[in-house]
Amino acid sequence: MAHPHASATLAAAMNRFAQQLAAHHLTLQRSALVTLQINLGRRCNQACRHCHVDAAPWRTEMMAADTARRIADWIQRHRPSVVDLTGGAPELNEHFRFLVETARSAGARVIDRCNLTILTEDGFDWLADFLAVNEVEIIASLPCYLEENVRQQRGDGVFAKSIAALRQLNALGYGTRLPLHLVYNPLGPTLPPPQAELEADYKEALARDHGVLFTRLFTITNQPIARFAENLRHQNRWDEYLDLLAAGFNPATVERLMCRNTLSVGWRGELFDCDFNQMLGLQLRNGHPLHLWDVTPADLADRGIQTGAHCLACTAGCGSSCTGAVTDQPLRPLFGEAISVNP
């Protein structure tokens, strides 16, 4: 017979996200693989204060040629539907073009997670044309349509460079013929506003003030890891933010979480359930740490997903993923007076 306090003891041992799943009688496991998300390294030409990767110009962790070749071989053999290239600034890796061309030749839809300012850096005048010729989908970070808010999060001069880059992409057909999506992160420890409403505001402001067009806006909740976690602790707001995320847990998001159909690959080829788990070192294992070339898509189906309290960021409100909100059915209280959002 089970000890009367067994359930309470088990709940205490669970992370806060696992407790929410258990309370709602939900499980989280992988479905069929759709997206192979590849982190090409931690180097970036920026050092944004919200960055969950801790990326910066001084980082040296970058994917080597042998790793890129082994990943390219896997892509050609298993042909994932989507290949999503991220960093750091993925374009800084010398094997970026090789991986784009390999994935496109394998029939994959290719995504470049671009910080926009890389397009204005010396030595990257080839980049915009290369992306357009290969019909690469661009998901670009622009945390606000107001210059001051961008300056606070990303630094001086970043907004002007981002607008210049967007105009360059528009001239090549991005935002009309080719997909150009923007990403919004709240400035502080709040949840994003409803995605559709904010997208309308972005489109109006960028077109009116800068003549810039884009396809869609993705809202992403800040993950309580890396630099953002450091800021929360410095402000003594860690517990407050975790409580906000837990209070906003939305069961409707779980089925659509990106970790169910996305596989995250580190710059050394290591495997993770998502990019956030990658930054926390939660590597997939099968008695030993797994690398991409150790598995097939079929090996991963129905596998359980490693979780932590940070996963609450993906299930609060309308949910959050690398392609924005995961449901249009938020919990009502999140957009009322009790919990503020950052427009």
Language model features with spans:
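Radical SAM enzyme [4Fe-4S]-AdoMet core and its adjacent flexible, acidic
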Residues: 1, 139, 147-259
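Core AdoMet radical
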Residues: 35, 55-64, 78-93, 104-123, ...
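Short loop/turn motifs at secondary-structure junctions
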Residues: 47, 79, 134-135, 176-179, ...
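C-terminal accessory regions of radical SAM enzymes
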Residues: 246-280
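Flexible mid-to-C-terminal extensions adjoining Fe-S/redox cofactors in radical SAM and related proteins
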Residues: 270-343
